[in-house]
A protein has these predicted regions:
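Catalytic Zn2+-binding segment of zinc metalloproteases
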Residues: 359, 365-382
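Sec-exported extracytoplasmic/periplasmic mature domains
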Residues: 303-311, 367-374, 417
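Post-HExxH zinc-binding segment in Zn-dependent metallohydrolases
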Residues: 381-421
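Classical Sec-dependent N-terminal signal peptides that target proteins to the secretory pathway
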Residues: 1-21
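N-terminal low-structure segments adjacent to metalloprotease catalytic domains
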Residues: 18-304
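Extracytoplasmic/secreted envelope proteins and their assembly/folding machinery
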Residues: 295-299, 303, 362, 394, ...
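Short pre-active-site segment immediately N-terminal to the catalytic Zn-binding motif
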Residues: 341-362
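Auxiliary, metal-adjacent structural segments of Zn-dependent hydrolase domains
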Residues: 281-339
Length: 421
């Protein structure tokens, strides 16, 4: 047991790793195809970061081209229709979430297999158009709208995976590092209520449970900055051999919890200094936009979202040197310049009336008042694939299907409400 203790001490000698990394683009897992197109188009025209199609794996190139052709076909069909009868491939109702126990995994092999399967399963009338270079028809080529939309949606999601792969590939080394912040080990232990005392007798555990526990503890080991996969695998193997899984649990669980909490907590450095909290009203200053149409856009969305019970958030309009402000740039992925930052950058190509824009401004304002994202993405070197998931698919800061939750109110109260003396 002394040998195991020494191994643990050597491996766990560094502080827990923070999951935030400012260099990567801020791209939530549920971006729409239109948002990917805007981003890739802007990056290409400015010769930024993103590889050209010729530099990519040809399988990624194929999925992107198929998705682009589908988009052009849908646009041509909708040009002759009303807004009510237009074909929609994306909507709040059809959006897919990626819960922590069913993560999204994508790479050229996975995406190519999906595209091949779709070529086989889609109606021939769709395949004949999308997988060719012929003139695009102005109708659905004889396919009923429901079938066309359902099948088109599958190919559109394949396009999104390919576009995301292309967008994130320039930062693949950073995404490899992000694997150390994978929370699934802690999540498994927490949701299954596994404690150290449950791990004191390795011999009594079923092979199936042992495999799950080993995987979980490997991941909690990786929640320390500087640990390598080989180191953590060695420690896990030693813990099994020496009946030391309980020790490994005790060595890693606090850091794993800290890592988990870092996706939800408003840290001291992210807390704003210009917020007031009086009774049930939290007031945040905001620079008055030059165009008056953006005042109700901001006020209606932000004040509607950030309320809980009798409590509510209010914006205080004015001119503030260090206050939040709204900025629009073409093709930019919406983001804030840091947690507790002041500059909310939105894509000027996206109409503010659309649902995606209305959700985005609510989510981005969450960063202004200090909330981190509670989704995670990394590159799994064993799978050779990107992996992403949302820690809570009902939470505004995790998912486009999410809303303000009680935990967010409690976090705001802890960060900003005056303490009773």
């Amino acid at each position: 047991m002394k040998t195991l203790g020494l191994s643990l001490t050597l491996v766990f000698s560094l502080p827990a790793m923070a999951h935030l990394n400012g260099a990567k683009p801020h791209m939530d897992p549920q971006m729409t195809s239109a948002e990917y197109r805007n981003y890739l188009s802007t990056q290409k025209s400015s010769n930024k970061n993103v590889k050209t199609l010729e530099d990519l794996d040809p399988r990624i190139e194929k999925s992107i081209k198929l998705g682009e052709r589908l988009s052009k076909w849908v646009n041509k069909i909708n040009a002759g229709r009303t807004a009510e009868t237009a074909i929609r491939l994306t909507s709040p109702e059809t959006r897919i979430s990626y819960p922590i126990n069913k993560p999204n995994k994508y790479n050229p092999t996975i995406l190519a297999a999906e595209a091949t399967a779709l070529e086989t399963s889609m109606p021939k009338a769709m395949v004949d158009v999308i997988w060719s270079n012929s003139e695009l028809p102005a109708d659905t080529n004889g396919i009923d709208d429901k079938t066309f939309a359902a099948q088109g949606r599958l190919l559109d999601r394949n396009y999104q995976g390919a576009a995301r792969y292309k967008s994130l590939s320039p930062w693949i080394e950073e995404y490899k590092w992000a694997a150390a912040s994978d929370v699934r080990g802690y999540y498994y232990l927490k949701t299954n209520n596994i404690k150290a005392e449950d791990l004191t007798d390795v011999a009594s555990m079923s092979p199936e449970k042992l495999d799950l526990v080993k995987e979980a503890l490997f991941r909690t080991c990786r929640n320390y900055e500087g640990t390598k996969e080989t180191q953590c695998q060695k420690v896990v193997d030693e813990s099994v051999t020496n009946n030391g899984l309980a020790d490994l649990y005790n060595f890693t669980i606090d850091a794993a919890k800290t890592n988990w909490d870092s996706f939800f907590k408003i840290t001291e450095s992210a807390r704003r200094k210009d917020v007031t909290w009086l009774n049930d009203i939290m007031t945040v200053p905001f620079n008055t936009p030059e165009l008056t149409k953006f005042i109700p856009y901001l006020q209606d969305n932000i004040e509607d979202e950030f309320r809980f019970g009798t409590w509510g958030l209010k914006l205080n309009w004015g001119t503030f040197e260090n206050g939040p402000r709204l900025v629009f740039k073409a093709g930019e992925v919406p983001h804030v310049n840091g947690l507790g930052g002041n500059e909310i950058t939105m894509d000027s190509n996206q109409p503010i009336e659309e649902y995606e824009s209305r959700w985005t401004i609510r989510h981005e304002f969450g960063h202004v008042i200090g909330f981190p994202d509670c989704y995670h993405e990394f590159y799994d070197e064993k799978l050779e694939a990107f992996v992403n998931y949302q820690l809570d698919t009902t939470d505004l800061m995790c998912s486009r299907a999410g809303n303000m939750k009680e935990r967010m109110y409690n976090e705001l109260k802890e960060a900003y409400a005056p303490t009773a003396e």
